[in-house]
């Protein structure tokens, strides 16, 4: 796995590897949590929505009155007049043709969703760590088979690019242009009403270029299909994990890659650009729980599996206060306790009276 390498090579703008290397930032060793990334992405993506609602007049722009009872018809308001199909038809109700909807939507709906700050930072850390795992990038559909290594770091001279042809030449030299071709070929007409709302086409996502300082790099890369550009101080989960799926192909500039330790810190040192923030760490070092359970160290102290027990389908409930056998099974001392209570009451047995003895010995 590429994220386990202690250092990362730096590639020049002509695609050749330079002699200098850079240490792998601590954020690439953060726990990868797909569940957390998915939930945070779902919440954060809702904050870009534009409020919408139906017209307050919709379904009520007609004159209609109820005909009352006695006509063997529903009491719903009906359009008056005659000489047209519309006269006599029901109006206003949500069950009526041309009526309003039930509970018309309002613009003051609660559109935004609050997310815990530490939760968002955890999700972004996981997304950055996942961008250094080649198998996750391939599973997401990125064409990185010919990429020299992941994470991919290029020289800071790229930040000074002014022309798109320079950016395209760089992508071709580092074998990343296949991902751009994939995006260009994926452009399709959107299904549904979105075609009418200025989002006529859909296409896949390509590489994400992360820079430290903009000396022209934004203008150079912004017109390439599928390529997105972001400052390392403004890393966004919507770009690092589009659709809530981990494994975005990221191209880092050298200075941006070196700044990651200042942005995210480590598990022991706080981040410089995030107040009192420490990187999360795994509770267990090996996430393969099945392998741990089946290891010799744990199996040597675990009791052997006993015979299988079949639970009785139905057990009749018996009252131990009335059933002596059940009481004895629940509390074996109950019988001795009851006998002891009788002995310790201190009462002497009452002698039989003369009248009883006379009747007893009667011939």
UniProtKB/Swiss-Prot annotation:
GO terms for cellular component: cytosolic large ribosomal subunit; nucleus; preribosome. It is found in: Cytoplasm; Nucleus. The modification Phosphoserine is found at residue 87. Keywords: Cytoplasm, Nucleus, Phosphoprotein, Ribonucleoprotein, Ribosomal protein. GO terms for biological process: cytoplasmic translation. Residues 280-363 are annotated as: C-terminal-extended nuclear localization signal. InterPro entries: Ribos_uL4_C_dom (IPR025755), Ribosomal_uL4 (IPR002136), Ribosomal_uL4_dom_sf (IPR023574), Ribosomal_uL4_euk/arc_CS (IPR013000), Ribosomal_uL4_euk/arch (IPR045240). One of its GO terms (molecular function) is structural constituent of ribosome. It holds the Pfam family Ribosomal_L4. Its main location: cytoplasm. Component of the large ribosomal subunit (LSU). Mature yeast ribosomes consist of a small (40S) and a large (60S) subunit. The 40S small subunit contains 1 molecule of ribosomal RNA (18S rRNA) and at least 33 different proteins. The large 60S subunit contains 3 rRNA molecules (25S, 5.8S and 5S rRNA) and at least 46 different proteins. uL4 is associated with the polypeptide exit tunnel. uL4 interacts with its chaperone ACL4 and the nuclear import receptor KAP104. Component of the ribosome, a large ribonucleoprotein complex responsible for the synthesis of proteins in the cell. The small ribosomal subunit (SSU) binds messenger RNAs (mRNAs) and translates the encoded message by selecting cognate aminoacyl-transfer RNA (tRNA) molecules. The large subunit (LSU) contains the ribosomal catalytic site termed the peptidyl transferase center (PTC), which catalyzes the formation of peptide bonds, thereby polymerizing the amino acids delivered by tRNAs into a polypeptide chain. The eukaryote-specific C-terminal extension harbors a nuclear import signal and delivers the ACL4-uL4/RPL4 complex to the pre-ribosome, triggering uL4 release from ACL4 and incorporation into the 60S ribosomal subunit. Belongs to the universal ribosomal protein uL4 family. There are 2 genes for uL4 in S.pombe. This is Large ribosomal subunit protein uL4A. It comes from Schizosaccharomyces pombe (strain 972 / ATCC 24843) (Fission yeast). The lineage of its organism: Eukaryota, Fungi, Dikarya, Ascomycota, Taphrinomycotina.
């Amino acid at each position: 796995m590429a994220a386990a390498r202690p250092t990362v090579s730096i590639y020049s703008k002509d695609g050749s590897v330079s002699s200098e290397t850079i240490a792998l930032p601590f954020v690439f060793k953060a726990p990868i949590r797909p569940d957390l990334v998915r939930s945070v992405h779902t919440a954060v993506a809702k904050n870009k929505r534009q409020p919408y609602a139906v017209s307050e007049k919709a379904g009520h722009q007609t004159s209609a009155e109820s005909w009352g009872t006695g006509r063997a018809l529903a009491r719903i308001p009906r359009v008056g007049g005659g000489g047209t199909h519309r006269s006599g038809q029901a109006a206003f109700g949500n069950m009526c043709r041309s009526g309003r909807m039930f509970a018309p939507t309002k613009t003051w709906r609660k559109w935004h969703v609050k997310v815990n700050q530490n939760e968002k930072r955890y999700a972004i850390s996981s997304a950055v760590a996942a961008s250094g795992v080649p198998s996750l990038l391939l599973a997401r559909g990125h064409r990185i088979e010919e990429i020299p290594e992941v994470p991919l770091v290029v020289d800071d001279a790229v930040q000074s690019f002014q022309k798109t042809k320079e950016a395209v030449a760089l992508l071709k030299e580092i074998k990343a242009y296949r991902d751009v071709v994939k995006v260009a070929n994926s452009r399709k007409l959107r299904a549904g009403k979105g075609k009418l709302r200025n989002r006529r086409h859909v296409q896949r996502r390509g590489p994400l270029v992360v820079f430290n300082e903009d000396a022209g790099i934004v203008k150079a890369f912004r017109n390439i299909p599928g390529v997105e550009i972001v400052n390392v101080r403004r890393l966004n989960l919507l770009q690092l994990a589009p659709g809530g799926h981990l494994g975005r192909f990221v191209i880092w500039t050298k200075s941006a890659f070196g700044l990651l330790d200042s942005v995210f810190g480590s598990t022991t040192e706080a981040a410089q650009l995030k107040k009192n923030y420490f990187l999360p760490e795994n509770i267990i070092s090996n996430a393969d729980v099945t392998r741990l359970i089946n290891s010799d160290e744990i199996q040597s102290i675990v009791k052997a599996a006993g015979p299988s027990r079949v639970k009785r389908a139905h057990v009749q409930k018996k009252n131990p206060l009335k059933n002596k056998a059940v009481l004895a099974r629940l509390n074996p001392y109950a019988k001795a306790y009851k006998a002891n209570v009788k002995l310790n009451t201190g009462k002497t047995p009452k002698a039989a009276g003369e009248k009883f003895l006379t009747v007893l010995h009667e011939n």
